[in-house]
Amino acid sequence: MTTQISKKRKFVADGVFYAELNEVLTRELAEDGYSGVEVRVTPMRTEIIIRATRTQNVLGEKGRRIRELTSLVQKRFKFPVDSVELYAEKVNNRGLCAIAQAESLRYKLLGGLAVRRACYGVLRFVMESGAKGCEVIVSGKLRAARAKSMKFKDGYMVSSGQPTKEYIDSAVRHVLLRQGVLGIKVKVMLDWDPKGISGPKTPLPDVVIIHSPKEEEAIYAPAQVAAPAALVADAPLTAVDYPAMIPVA
């Protein structure tokens, strides 16, 4: 017998499940370019789509790793047998994915690269991938003992209103270094795409589009036709105007 729960509890339970699933996959697949997860619930089963830049590593040899992840999710969240299925989807343009860029910056800093050089590298790569704007913030003990924050920006970036929900992709990561923990925040502003492939379909509300004027058809003056002499005042009548005037032999 299924238990009935209110809509409020259902939304809260779905949110907690998504947050915990995202946390588990972030820890498991951080090195494989994990870029988010999507959950689709159907009457027959629950489909979990994992987005990553290196899908071959997510699948593993002969699909071994994806089966292990399926078993882990099934046991952790108490799904019935064969009721959950995991899929791997490749990120088309990782330069426009904030999560992928935050992870990339994290591994650059762990590798010992200078903060300024690593941030400018991410900034350049994002802008070359077709983004409208990018912002990278790194905060913590960067050089001295006192913590501070460094911000790197390029392009156009909106910070309020509905466009922030549609155009801005953001990600936050933390990296543990010898001097302490650094916080990484990456924001990518997508460009408008009428097809909705690389950006949102809805244009920005403050963008004015000036359409080119339509080409008007050329209007030609009517051709002037000589009027017959009968219609012209003070003109002599001829046999052409009145055939009855033609003399009969």
UniProtKB/Swiss-Prot annotation:
Q: Which UniProt keywords apply?
A: Phosphoprotein, Ribonucleoprotein, Ribosomal protein, RNA-binding
> Cross-referenced PROSITE patterns, in alphabetical order?
KH_TYPE_2 (PS50823)
The PTM Phosphoserine maps to 212
Q: Which Gene3D superfamilies match?
A: 3.30.300.20, Ribosomal protein S3, C-terminal domain
Describe the location of the KH type-2 domain by residue ranges.
Answer: 21-92
- Example of a GO MF term: structural constituent of ribosome
Q: Which GO terms describe its biological process?
A: translation
**A single Gene Ontology CC term:** cytosolic small ribosomal subunit
| Alphabetical list of NCBIfam families matching this protein | PRK04191.1 (NF003219), uS3_euk_arch (TIGR01008)
**Assigned protein family:** Belongs to the universal ribosomal protein uS3 family.
In its UniProt entry, what is this protein called? Answer: Small ribosomal subunit protein uS3y
What is the protein's species of origin?
A: Arabidopsis thaliana
